[in-house]
C-alpha cells in the first residue's frame, strides 16, 4: 500500500504540479487537484506505464480520486 | 542520391472562425477549447473553394520557392481525405492547372499522416534515380466533413493547404530517416460516418497519438544515428497542443523549438505539417543544416515521421 501510494503520489505531483500534501486518498482529481479530462487521461497513461498494466476506458472512467487509483492498481496486482 | 525539400508553400483561406463564433453555434466556451486543444481560431474555405483550388495555390508557392518549373515535375502526390470528388483526383486536377504535363499524378489517402506518406513516397522515386522533382501537397477542406452540431469535433478542424517540392540535394543535406506505420485495429476510433461527418473517440485517439508521436520521433532520431540533443526543431502534426506537448517532452526540447500553429488554424489534417514548415521558415526558426523532425498521426490509424537535415 505505502509503496503504491508513494509511486502514485509522485506521478500526480509531477503531472499536475500540486503539493504532495494535497494528494490525499480522498482527493478528487478534478475537484481538488485541478485536473481536467485530458489530465486524467494522461495520468492514467502514466500509471499504466509505471505499473506495467492496461487500464480499460471503462475502468479509467471510474477512477475519480487518488484512493480509487491506488485501490485499482492494488486489485490488479 | 539524397532526397530533400527544395521549396515549400501554403494557402490559408481568408475566413476566420473564432472560438467565440463557435460559442454561438454549439454549447462550448472559448476557455474550454483553449485549455483542451490550444485552438483559438481556424480558417474556413468559402463554399465554392475546394481542395484543388487550395492545392494549386500552395503548389505554385512551393514551385516558385524551389525554382522548379511546373513542366519539370515528374510526379504529383496529393494527400487529402477531402478531394473535390473521388475522381478525377485532386492531383490530376492540379496537374492540369499547373501545366505539369510530364508529371504522373495520384492522391494519397493516409488521413492526417498523409503528408508524411507523400514525402516518403517521393523520396523513394528521387533516391532510386527514377524521378527528379516530386510535388507533395497536403490539403484539406475539413469543414465539409465536420458535423457543426457536434461540440466534440466542431471545435477542432480547419481548412488549408501546404506543399513541398521534393528533389535531389547534396549528400550532407536531406531526409536522414523515416518511419511509416498503420494500425487498422484502431480504425474505429476516428472515421467518416455514413453522413460524411468525422467521428472521433477523443480519449482513445489522444492516448494513441501521445504514445505514437513520441515513439516515432525517437525512432527516426535513432535511425538517423542521432541523439535527442541533435534535434534543432520539431514539427508535429497540429492536432491538439496537449498531444504536441507530450511529443516535445519526450524529446526534451524547449518550447521555442517546437512549431505551433494550431492556435491559428486548428487541425488541418494533412496540411498542418507543411503549413507549419512554411511559417517556421518564414520566421527564421529553421536554418540551413538544422536537423528537423516532422511527425504526424491520423485516422486509419496511420502515422509517419521523418528526420531531415534542412537545406539543398
UniProtKB/Swiss-Prot annotation, chain A:
Main location: cytoplasm
Keywords carried by this UniProt record: Cytoplasm, Fatty acid biosynthesis, Fatty acid metabolism, Lipid biosynthesis, Lipid metabolism, Phosphopantetheine, Phosphoprotein
NCBIfam families, per database record: acyl_carrier, PRK00982.1-2, PRK00982.1-3, PRK00982.1-4, PRK00982.1-5
Lineage: Bacteria, Bacillati, Bacillota, Bacilli, Bacillales
Entry GO MF terms: acyl binding; acyl carrier activity
Gene this protein is translated from: acpA
Family annotation (PROSITE patterns): CARRIER, PHOSPHOPANTETHEINE
Pfam families: PP-binding (PF00550)
Protein family membership: Belongs to the acyl carrier protein (ACP) family.
GO BP annotations, alphabetical order: lipid A biosynthetic process
Keyword RNA-binding: no
Descriptive protein name: Acyl carrier protein
Functional description taken from the UniProt entry: Carrier of the growing fatty acid chain in fatty acid biosynthesis.
Pathway: Lipid metabolism; fatty acid biosynthesis
Subcellular location: Cytoplasm
Gene Ontology, cellular component aspect: cytosol; membrane
Positions bearing O-(pantetheine 4'-phosphoryl)serine: 37
Modification after translation, per record: 4'-phosphopantetheine is transferred from CoA to a specific serine of apo-ACP by AcpS. This modification is essential for activity because fatty acids are bound in thioester linkage to the sulfhydryl of the prosthetic group.
InterPro entries linked: ACP, ACP-like_sf, PP-bd_ACP, Ppantetheine_attach_site
Coiled-coil regions, chain positions: none
Domain of life: Bacteria
Domain Carrier: 2-77
Curated annotation (Swiss-Prot), chain B:
GO cellular component: cytoplasm
Catalysed reaction, written as an equation: (2S)-2-methylbutanoyl-CoA + malonyl-[ACP] + H(+) = (4S)-4-methyl-3-oxohexanoyl-[ACP] + CO2 + CoA; 2-methylpropanoyl-CoA + malonyl-[ACP] + H(+) = 4-methyl-3-oxopentanoyl-[ACP] + CO2 + CoA; 3-methylbutanoyl-CoA + malonyl-[ACP] + H(+) = 5-methyl-3-oxohexanoyl-[ACP] + CO2 + CoA; malonyl-[ACP] + acetyl-CoA + H(+) = 3-oxobutanoyl-[ACP] + CO2 + CoA
Subcellular location: Cytoplasm
Catalytic site positions: 112, 237, 267
Pathway where this protein functions: Lipid metabolism; fatty acid biosynthesis
EC annotation from Swiss-Prot or TrEMBL: 2.3.1.180, 2.3.1.300
Predominant localisation class: cytoplasm
Domain of life: Bacteria
Any GO MF annotation of the entry: 3-oxoacyl-[acyl-carrier-protein] synthase activity
Family: Belongs to the thiolase-like superfamily. FabH family.
Name assigned to this protein: Beta-ketoacyl-[acyl-carrier-protein] synthase III 1
Gene encoding the protein: fabHA
Amino acid at each position: 500500500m505505502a509503496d503504491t501510494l508513494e509511486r502514485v503520489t509522485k506521478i500526480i505531483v509531477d503531472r499536475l504540479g500540486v503539493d504532495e500534501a494535497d494528494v490525499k486518498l480522498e482527493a478528487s482529481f478534478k475537484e481538488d487537484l485541478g485536473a481536467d479530462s485530458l489530465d486524467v487521461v494522461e495520468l492514467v497513461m502514466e500509471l499504466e506505464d509505471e505499473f506495467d498494466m492496461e487500464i480499460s476506458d471503462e475502468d479509467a472512467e471510474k477512477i475519480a480520486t487518488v484512493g480509487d487509483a491506488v485501490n485499482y492498481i492494488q486489485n490488479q496486482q | 542520391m539524397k532526397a530533400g525539400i527544395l521549396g515549400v508553400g501554403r494557402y490559408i483561406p481568408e475566413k476566420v472562425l473564432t472560438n467565440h463564433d463557435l460559442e454561438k453555434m454549439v454549447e462550448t466556451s472559448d476557455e474550454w477549447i483553449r485549455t483542451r486543444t490550444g485552438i483559438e481560431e481556424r480558417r474556413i474555405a468559402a463554399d465554392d473553394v475546394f481542395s484543388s483550388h487550395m492545392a494549386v495555390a500552395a503548389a505554385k508557392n512551393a514551385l516558385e520557392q524551389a525554382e522548379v518549373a511546373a513542366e519539370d515535375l515528374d510526379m504529383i502526390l496529393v494527400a487529402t481525405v477531402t478531394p473535390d470528388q473521388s475522381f478525377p483526383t485532386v492531383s490530376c486536377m492540379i496537374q492540369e492547372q499547373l501545366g505539369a504535363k510530364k508529371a504522373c499524378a495520384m492522391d494519397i489517402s493516409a488521413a492526417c499522416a498523409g503528408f508524411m506518406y507523400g514525402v516518403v513516397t517521393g523520396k523513394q522515386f528521387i533516391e532510386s534515380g527514377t524521378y527528379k522533382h516530386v510535388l507533395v501537397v497536403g490539403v484539406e477542406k475539413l469543414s465539409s466533413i465536420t458535423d457543426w452540431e457536434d461540440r466534440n469535433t466542431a471545435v477542432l478542424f480547419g481548412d488549408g493547404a501546404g506543399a513541398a517540392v521534393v528533389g535531389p540535394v547534396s549528400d550532407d543535406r536531406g531526409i536522414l530517416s523515416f518511419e511509416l506505420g498503420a494500425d487498422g485495429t484502431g480504425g474505429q476510433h476516428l472515421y467518416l460516418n455514413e453522413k460524411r461527418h468525422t467521428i472521433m473517440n477523443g480519449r482513445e485517439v489522444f492516448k494513441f497519438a501521445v504514445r505514437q508521436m513520441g515513439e516515432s520521433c525517437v525512432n527516426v532520431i535513432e535511425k538517423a544515428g542521432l541523439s535527442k540533443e541533435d534535434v534543432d526543431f520539431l514539427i508535429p502534426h497540429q492536432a491538439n497542443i496537449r498531444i504536441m506537448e507530450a511529443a516535445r517532452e519526450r524529446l526534451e526540447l524547449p518550447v521555442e523549438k517546437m512549431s505551433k500553429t494550431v492556435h491559428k488554424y486548428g487541425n488541418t489534417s494533412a496540411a498542418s505539417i507543411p503549413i507549419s514548415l512554411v511559417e517556421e521558415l518564414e520566421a527564421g526558426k529553421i536554418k540551413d543544416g538544422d536537423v528537423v523532425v516532422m511527425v504526424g498521426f491520423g485516422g486509419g490509424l496511420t502515422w509517419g515521421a521523418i528526420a531531415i537535415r534542412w537545406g539543398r
